[in-house]
């Protein structure tokens, strides 16, 4: 560990970078060295390996045409399964329990339509009031399709402070009328990590199925879905996994549920040996592949080939270790350098935080615009939230130090005041 009189100096940050075991991976990403990108929790950066994977798949189309489904470097017909196998270690699952398919929301629709089986008193779904809106839209939609009023049958656990959830409150809502629970692994605003193992155990003790949205944890923190006995999970791949805008999502189904018929069946739900028999009676795949629906979006799945290779080399434990150091260092600097400017850190201070920080300020929208003008890329969340995500694979401690200096300059010089305090179309 570097030894300096003050952790607040640039030299201290540079020494942290000098002993960073993941430093070499930064060179694999396309990075504008004149800017500081801290929005990897919304969209990760492009790596040269992800780029090459996409080019390889394009080349297969060019060379083989229709035969690209079974020929070439990465045959398309098996990509969802082969990438599921590569991603399984990130979630602590067996290869056959993970499939790369669809989008986050379509996968949630698929899983709820497959696992929500109201019977008797059990007619309600338990969620939370801090979840990402799309999940709530999907849950309400599924209740409508089953003939239930979401106002009555969707129970949302309340937050005491608008930032964090109390697991005791969640467990208290696991009542006899709950048939299914869907929760985030990491809250998208505050970055709080929920105790998935504890919640899963509590749910199963009450005969309730439970699934998790891993969008803000996949590629950032380790998971043990099999060990925790989670029933299902789903996630995107364009944030920390660096799959690119609109990259194909993924899902996990615990093997104990293999054989459960998919609620939304389609062409790719089929057992691959039977798929081209063209029978009108579906023979589902015998693994998580049964929960696919349509043809995979090959060009949106291809970058994951290269991206997941980086994760295999870096290791999710090392990524998490550096991530905690980056965010801890950033919090230390915020508290020291910005104490005069009314910022409030709203994410957990302990290791129950994900890979981003969430700070609040009444002028947050304007401050984010001022940061972008200074080539620091943050993320605004209405009404007054700023998310800062130093990514372990490509951000540096020096960038963290520079960011806080830029933020201090913006506040001291009131550079934010020339902007309107409102979000852009894409925040």
From Swiss-Prot:
Task: Name the cofactor(s).
Answer: pyridoxal 5'-phosphate
GO BP annotations listed:
anthranilate metabolic process; L-kynurenine catabolic process; L-tryptophan catabolic process to kynurenine; NAD biosynthetic process; quinolinate biosynthetic process
Q: In which pathway does it act?
A: Amino-acid degradation; L-kynurenine degradation; L-alanine and anthranilate from L-kynurenine: step 1/1; Cofactor biosynthesis; NAD(+) biosynthesis; quinolinate from L-kynurenine: step 2/3
GO terms for molecular function, please? Answer: kynureninase activity; pyridoxal phosphate binding
Write the Enzyme Commission number(s) for this entry.
3.7.1.3
Organism (species): Shouchella clausii (strain KSM-K16) (Alkalihalobacillus clausii)
Q: Kindly provide the name given to this protein in its UniProt entry.
A: Kynureninase
What NCBIfam families does the annotation carry? kynureninase
């Amino acid at each position: 560990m570097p030894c300096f009189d003050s952790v607040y100096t640039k030299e201290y940050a540079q020494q942290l970078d000098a002993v960073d075991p993941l430093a070499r991976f930064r060179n694999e990403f396309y990075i504008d060295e004149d800017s500081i990108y801290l929005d990897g929790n919304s969209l990760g950066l492009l790596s040269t390996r992800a780029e090459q994977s996409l080019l390889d798949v394009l080349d297969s189309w060019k060379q083989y045409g229709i035969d690209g489904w079974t020929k070439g470097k990465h045959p398309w017909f098996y990509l969802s399964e082969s990438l599921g196998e590569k991603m399984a270690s990130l979630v602590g699952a067996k290869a056959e329990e993970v499939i790369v398919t669809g989008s986050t929301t379509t996968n949630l629709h698929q899983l709820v339509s497959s696992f929500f089986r109201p019977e008797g008193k059990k007619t309600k779904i338990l969620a939370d009031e801090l979840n990402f809106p799309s999940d709530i839209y999907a849950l309400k939609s599924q209740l409508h399709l089953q003939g239930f009023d979401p106002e009555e049958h969707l129970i949302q656990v309340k937050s005491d402070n608008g930032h964090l959830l109390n697991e005791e409150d969640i467990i208290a809502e696991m009542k006899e009328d709950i048939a299914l629970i869907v929760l985030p692994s990491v809250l998208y605003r505050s970055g709080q990590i929920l105790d998935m193992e504890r919640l899963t155990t509590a749910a199963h003790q009450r005969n309730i199925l439970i699934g998790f949205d891993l969008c803000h944890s996949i590629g950032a923190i380790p998971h043990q879905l099999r060990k925790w006995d989670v029933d299902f999970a789903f996630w995107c791949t364009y944030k920390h996994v660096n799959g690119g805008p609109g990259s194909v999502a993924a899902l996990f189904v615990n093997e104990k549920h293999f054989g459960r018929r998919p609620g939304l069946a389609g062409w790719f739900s089929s057992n691959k040996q039977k798929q081209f028999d063209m029978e009108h009676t579906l023979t589902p795949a015998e693994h998580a592949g049964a929960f696919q629906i349509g043809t995979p979006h090959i060009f949106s799945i291809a970058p994951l080939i290269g991206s997941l290779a980086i994760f295999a080399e870096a290791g999710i434990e090392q990524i998490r270790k550096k991530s905690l150091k980056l965010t801890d260092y950033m919090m230390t600097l915020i508290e020291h350098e910005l104490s005069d400017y009314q910022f409030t850190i709203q994410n957990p201070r302990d290791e129950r935080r994900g890979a981003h920080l969430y700070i609040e300020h009444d002028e947050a929208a304007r401050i984010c615009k001022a940061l972008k003008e200074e080539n620091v890329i943050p993320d605004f969340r209405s009404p007054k939230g700023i998310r800062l995500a130093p990514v372990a694979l490509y951000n540096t401690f020096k960038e963290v130090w520079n960011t806080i200096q830029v933020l201090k300059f913006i506040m001291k010089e009131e550079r934010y005041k020339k902007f309107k305090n409102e979000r852009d179309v894409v925040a």
